[in-house]
Every structure is written in structure tokens, then in C-alpha cells.
């Protein structure tokens, strides 16, 4: 009774407090996986745009006094809840690296962990959940030219990573519930690269140092999307900000790329030559490369009871290097005004400059 009386006498003051809390909460977010490559760039852009940022991850990847870190297991709701309580938006970009080839780990983190994220968001009163998905959820190793979000999920995903990203994306989009003020969206980037990239550039340079970048698969004309990391982050933030204004965006996936498809081998060559390595000069017909990779995969299956081999030359890697796969951003442009912030030329230049420690001496 006393509470009711006090609430009645201070109604204006309490309402004002709620408004202040709502305004401050709207600019407070948590980045799950914020210690990773994409996550760190996301934290930086969010801070620049005036957000208060929490990071949840299995380890603290950097120091920043403006960021509150929460360390824990993504699948443990007790670990996760403190990082999500009191925030309006959650950006979920945590995932094992695609090349890890650990099916159980992918399933646990990408699917089970994401279900835990959804449940915890609801418990904590989070209003928006933006997932980092992947354009590969629709790719099956055959050409995709200017693919839209209407393409069906891959019936035969190219790897365990993609298989679990499909499960993850479906779970997040199905969780969209405007009636309960919980809105979700998925961002599908493709070929993320940029400063501090732990995968594409280091792996490419390592292959070049070992003499494995002398050949290109196919005629070198197949167009592919590579996306600068800052453009990927920009797409996430735009989606979140427009999701609060237009609930009709909820429950949808959006392709986010540089909107400049580039021949696969041209892109790799620009990185290589920018760091003083030779670009591939010789062509292997696509059909021949695929056939050889297929035979190798059969050999690996035959000897697998005796010896475990992880071949790097696989049919799906041949397909990734030799097919067209680029995607339309028209949906993101139309619904939340996405435009790449950084052009491909500038993105490649900045990326090469950031990896000066990998440069080959002339």
C-alpha cells in the first residue's frame, strides 16, 4: 500500500525517470563475440557512434576502459545474463572459425549457444537481437549471380560451419516477436576482410610462402563478393537502428557486401602483389581441379580407418575458388538505407597497409 501511495504522489518524477532510463538503454548494447575480428571492429564503431558497450566472450581480447567485459560460456545462461541485463540491443557475432572442421563445436556454439542467447535476451528484457549470419547459407557449390535473400537455404551445406549457421539463422529469425517487443534480424556478409583479419590474409600469405599460390582454378573470371569489415559492421548497426523504428524489418535476413563483385583471383592477386608476392600465373581448368579434388576426397575416405588426414584441396574449396557467388544488397539498401562506407580500392589498400609485418622483402 505504501508503495502505491508513493507511486501516486511521485507519478511525474517516476515517469521522467523511466524516460531517462529508456533513452539511455536505447544506446546500450552488448556484443557477443566482441573479442574477435568482427567483434572488435563492431565495438569500435559503436563507441564512435555514442553507444555504451558491453562485450561477452570466452576471453578478453583487448583493453578499453570504455568497455565492460563479461567472460563466460555462451551456452551458460548464468554467465550470459549479467552481460545482457539492462541493454536494448545485442549483436551476436560469436562463432568458431569456419576452418576448424569441428562439427560438435560448431553445433554447440552456433546452435545451442544461440538458443541460449535467445532465451537470455527474453529473460533480460532485450528488445533487439542482430545475428551475424553468412551468405553461404544458400551456397551449394554452384554459381550464384546477384543472389537475393529469397534463395532457399542450402539442402547440402558446404561444411559444418554453414550447416550450423543455417540452424542458427532459422532460430533467430523464428524468435522475432513484435507483440512481446523482441525483434530479430540476421546480417549475411560474405568474404569478410580488413585490418586484424586472422584468417584470409594470413592464410593466403602462408600459402604463398610455401609456393602454393602459383595456379588459379578456372579462367579467373568468376565474380565473388569480398566485404570490408567496416562495411559489415555498418550494416549491423543500420539494421539495429531501423529495427527499432520499423518492426516490419523483424524476422528477416539481409545480404551485406561491398556491392562490388570482383574476380576471385583478381582480389587474391591484389593482396599478394600488395605484399610483394607473385600473383598466380597458371590456370588449371575447373573441371580438372574438381575431379582431382574429388578423387583425393575418396582416397581420404578409404584410408580414414587407418590414418586421419585433413586435406586442404577439397571439392568445396575448388568450388569456392572457381564459381560465381555474389549477392544483391538491394533489400538492405531499400529497407534501411545501406551503402558501403569504404570502396573496394580503399579497403584493399588499407588492408595491405595493416599487414606490413607480412610483407616480403624485395
UniProtKB/Swiss-Prot annotation:
Gene Ontology molecular function: any one: 3-beta-hydroxysteroid dehydrogenase (NAD+)/C4-decarboxylase activity
EC number: 1.1.1.170
Biological process annotations from GO: cholesterol biosynthetic process; cholesterol metabolic process; hair follicle development; labyrinthine layer blood vessel development; smoothened signaling pathway
Topology of the protein relative to the lipid bilayer: Single-pass membrane protein
Reaction equations catalysed: a 3beta-hydroxysteroid-4alpha-carboxylate + NADP(+) = a 3-oxosteroid + CO2 + NADPH; a 3beta-hydroxysteroid-4alpha-carboxylate + NAD(+) = a 3-oxosteroid + CO2 + NADH; 4alpha-carboxyzymosterol + NADP(+) = zymosterone + CO2 + NADPH; 4alpha-carboxy-4beta-methyl-5alpha-cholest-8-en-3beta-ol + NADP(+) = 4alpha-methyl-5alpha-cholest-8-en-3-one + CO2 + NADPH
Subunit (UniProt): Homodimer.
Protein name: Sterol-4-alpha-carboxylate 3-dehydrogenase, decarboxylating
Organism listed in the record: Mus musculus
Amino acid at each position: 500500500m505504501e508503495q502505491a501511495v508513493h507511486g501516486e504522489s511521485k507519478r511525474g518524477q517516476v515517469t521522467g525517470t523511466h524516460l531517462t532510463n529508456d533513452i539511455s538503454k536505447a544506446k546500450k548494447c552488448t556484443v557477443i563475440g566482441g573479442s574477435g575480428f568482427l567483434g572488435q571492429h563492431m565495438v569500435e564503431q559503436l563507441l564512435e557512434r555514442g553507444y555504451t558497450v558491453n562485450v561477452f566472450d570466452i576471453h578478453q581480447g583487448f583493453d578499453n576502459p570504455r568497455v565492460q567485459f563479461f567472460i563466460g560460456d555462451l551456452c551458460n545462461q548464468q554467465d550470459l545474463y549479467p552481460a545482457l541485463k539492462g541493454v536494448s540491443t545485442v549483436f551476436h557475432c560469436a562463432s568458431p572459425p569456419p576452418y576448424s572442421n569441428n562439427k560438435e563445436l560448431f553445433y554447440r556454439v552456433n546452435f545451442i549457444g544461440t538458443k541460449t542467447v535467445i532465451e537470455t535476451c527474453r529473460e533480460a528484457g532485450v528488445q533487439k537481437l542482430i545475428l551475424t549470419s553468412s551468405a553461404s547459407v544458400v551456397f551449394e557449390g554452384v554459381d550464384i549471380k546477384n543472389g537475393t535473400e529469397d534463395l532457399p537455404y542450402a539442402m547440402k551445406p558446404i561444411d559444418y560451419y554453414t550447416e550450423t549457421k543455417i540452424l542458427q539463422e532459422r532460430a533467430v529469425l523464428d524468435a522475432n516477436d513484435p507483440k512481446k517487443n523482441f525483434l530479430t534480424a540476421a546480417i549475411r556478409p560474405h568474404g569478410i576482410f580488413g585490418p586484424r583479419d586472422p584468417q584470409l590474409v594470413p592464410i593466403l600469405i602462408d600459402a604463398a610462402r610455401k609456393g602454393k599460390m602459383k595456379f588459379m582454378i578456372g579462367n579467373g573470371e568468376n565474380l565473388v563478393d569480398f566485404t570490408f569489415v567496416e562495411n559489415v559492421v555498418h550494416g549491423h548497426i543500420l539494421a539495429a537502428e531501423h529495427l527499432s523504428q520499423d518492426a516490419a524489418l523483424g524476422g528477416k535476413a539481409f545480404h551485406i557486401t561491398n556491392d562490388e563483385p570482383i574476380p576471385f583471383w583478381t582480389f587474391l592477386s591484389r593482396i599478394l602483389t600488395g605484399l610483394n608476392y607473385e600473383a598466380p600465373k597458371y590456370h588449371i581448368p575447373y573441371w580438372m581441379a574438381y575431379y582431382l579434388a574429388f578423387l583425393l576426397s575418396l582416397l581420404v575416405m578409404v584410408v580414414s580407418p587407418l590414418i586421419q588426414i585433413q586435406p586442404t584441396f577439397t571439392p568445396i574449396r575448388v568450388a569456392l575458388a572457381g564459381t560465381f557467388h555474389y549477392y544483391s544488397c538491394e533489400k538492405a539498401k531499400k529497407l534501411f538505407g545501406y551503402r558501403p562506407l569504404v570502396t573496394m580500392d580503399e579497403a584493399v589498400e588499407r588492408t595491405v597497409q595493416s599487414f606490413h609485418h607480412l610483407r616480403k622483402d624485395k
